[in-house]
Amino acid sequence: MIRVNSLQVDSRLLPLSLQANAGEVWHVIGPNGCGKSTLLAALAGMIPFSGSVQVGGLNVSQASLSELARHRAYLAQNDKPSFQLHVFQYLALSVPANVALERSEVASEIDQISRLLNIDDKLHRSIHQLSGGEWQRVRLAGSCLQVSPVLNPSARLLIWDEPAAPLDIAQESLLYRLIERMAGQGLTVIMANHDLNRTLRHADQVLLLSRGVLYRAGSAKEVLTQEVLQSVFGTSIRRVELEGHPHLLFD
């Protein structure tokens, strides 16, 4: 379980609290500059904050980086590193140290996640030979290996900052299959997202931020209403039903 009590980051993010259960998928949404990345970085223990964040039994503000790495994975928006690595080397570095499994079991988990993201044919390529979408899928695979319950029983939380941003439509579908897999294994997934229709379909819980303030929180159905979204995003939005499912239309 993830417990957040009165989390605040100076004037960028005003106090908010939440409780997320194992296996839940949370989407953090809102206009650019509303505090999404700040919230995720604080949850990950990467920036100072006031209040408290508990990941399982771990107090995030008091934990070392190595302790944090055992309990959560955090994927920020980032460029490729300047050093040279092949994809399989990058993924191997993502596997937690001192894994109490046979090498074949570790290789099997790497293979399954690589196949799920359609990067299994790129394992022997340099990361600098990858397109933006390919590199993002490698990064997603690495973060999943870090907190895979098969490899790391201590892991509780997967934090992604706009993971779909560099992905095309087909690759985004792979991403949501991966999210379903990781949540199905008991991890809590908290991610920033701009595709509100994906949030409507896939999020168990939604945090809507506006100017550093938690404007709404609840299920996707409760938060993603026409009135609420129009007031925050300042644009015309319609919610319609198509084949029995809700969809958002934007001007």
Swiss-Prot record:
Domain of life from the UniProt record: Bacteria
GO molecular function: ABC-type vitamin B12 transporter activity; ATP binding; ATP hydrolysis activity
Annotated Gene Ontology cellular component terms: plasma membrane
This protein's record includes keyword Membrane: yes
Matching InterPro entries: AAA+_ATPase, ABC_transporter-like_ATP-bd, ABC_transptr_BtuD, Metal_Ion_Import_ABC, P-loop_NTPase
Domain ABC transporter: 2-236
Subcellular location: Cell inner membrane
EC number(s) per entry: 7.6.2.8
Pfam families: ABC_tran
SMART domains, per the entry: AAA
Keyword Transmembrane helix: no
Reaction(s) the record says it catalyses: an R-cob(III)alamin(out) + ATP + H2O = an R-cob(III)alamin(in) + ADP + phosphate + H(+)
Broadest EC class assigned to this enzyme: translocase
Residues annotated as binding ATP: 30-37
Key words of the record: ATP-binding, Cell inner membrane, Cell membrane, Membrane, Nucleotide-binding, Translocase, Transport
Topology relative to the membrane: Peripheral membrane protein
Family to which the UniProt record says this protein belongs: Belongs to the ABC transporter superfamily. Vitamin B12 importer (TC 3.A.1.13.1) family.
Subunit structure and binding partners: The complex is composed of two ATP-binding proteins (BtuD), two transmembrane proteins (BtuC) and a solute-binding protein (BtuF).
Functional note: Part of the ABC transporter complex BtuCDF involved in vitamin B12 import. Responsible for energy coupling to the transport system.
Official protein name in the record: Vitamin B12 import ATP-binding protein BtuD
